[in-house]
Design a protein with these regions (language model features):
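Zn2+-dependent peptidoglycan hydrolase active-site motif and core
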Residues: 80-82, 86-131, 153-158
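Intrinsic-disorder/low-complexity peptide segments enriched for small residues
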Residues: 21, 126, 170-173, 239
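Short, solvent-exposed loop/turn segments at the edges of secondary structure
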Residues: 53-58, 104-106, 116-118, 151-155, ...
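Surface-exposed, glycine-biased beta-strand/turn segments
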Residues: 3-107, 139-140, 191-242
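Short hydrophobic beta/alpha edge segments that flank linear recognition/processing sites
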Residues: 106-111, 138-162, 168, 173
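Polybasic, proline/glycine-rich intrinsically disordered low-complexity segments
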Residues: 160-208
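Short acidic, gly/pro-rich beta-turn/loop elements at beta-sheet edges
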Residues: 101, 133, 166-168
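Short, well-ordered loop/turn sites that connect or cap secondary structure elements
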Residues: 88, 132, 137-138, 144
Length: 242
């Protein structure tokens, strides 16, 4: 295939030959179109300018329970500087954007697979190895950095640029069977269970506060924020690992 050939979002190539992160410490993962974190679908047809129906098109991986997050009681284990990120593919790291935090400089960046330039892997909040702060070529499985934030989560977004807009898909849609086997060993039974369908999300629209400076935080349309928070932490949005 030519590197710039179009890609079918419903049937993307399974090119991620390595997991993007150390899976061992993680106990739960959000689904695509979950309402956790903040609205994340900018540049796609699903982006709702009114903030009426919002969703996150990235997977969050958490090593802690929702109770630990609420209480700030993480115990002795800290993911920061311990959990490693890897390149899932042979490709190039581009658009490396630094951001200063209390802990130092963290980075957001894109990895474009060599053979599929319309596909993009987006990484956030990474303590990047020094050799990559200007980008450059990467190989599948290459260690590129660590979790930056204290008790930080893992995050990954995958998008297809069709020349007009972006279409976000799941990391599970592009991983090889060998990589998926790592997740199967932790109780994931199908790739599909990691995505809430567009139709399902539209049938249960969740609003967010666009323009809030935080990327658009989700909130309860009914006003019962406590019940909403509990639902947000539950199985409609998260898949528990074994």
């Amino acid at each position: 295939p030519t590197a710039y050939a179009s890609i079918d979002p419903a049937n993307p190539p399974k090119i991620a030959t390595h997991n993007f992160i150390d899976l061992d410490p993680y106990i739960r993962i959000t689904k695509i179109r979950a309402v956790y974190g903040h609205n994340y679908n900018y540049g796609s047809p699903e982006y709702d300018l009114t903030g009426t129906s919002c969703s996150s098109m990235k997977h969050y991986l958490d090593a802690y329970t929702s109770d630990q997050r609420w209480d700030g009681n993480f115990g002795s284990y800290d993911t920061r500087g311990v959990v490693k990120f890897y390149s899932p593919v042979d490709g190039n790291m581009h658009t490396v954007v630094p951001q200063e935090t209390e802990q130092g400089t963290e980075y957001q960046f894109y990895i474009y697979p060599t053979d599929y330039q319309r596909l993009t892997f987006t990484f956030h909040h990474v303590d990047l190895l020094e050799e990559f702060v200007s980008g450059g070529s990467v190989t599948a499985g290459q260690h590129i950095g660590y979790i930056m934030r204290p008790n930080g989560q893992g995050e990954i977004a995958v998008s297809i640029n069709n020349g007009v807009n972006l279409q976000y898909i799941s990391f599970f849609d592009v991983m090889t069977d060998e990589v998926f086997a790592e997740y199967q060993a932790r109780g994931i039974t199908s790739r599909d269970q990691m995505t809430i369908s567009k139709e399902e999300r539209a049938a249960n629209p969740i609003p967010c506060t666009l323009g809030d400076g935080y990327g658009g935080k989700f909130y309860s349309a009914s006003g019962d924020q406590e019940a909403f928070n509990e639902w947000q932490s539950g199985p409609d949005n998260w898949v528990e690992l074994e």
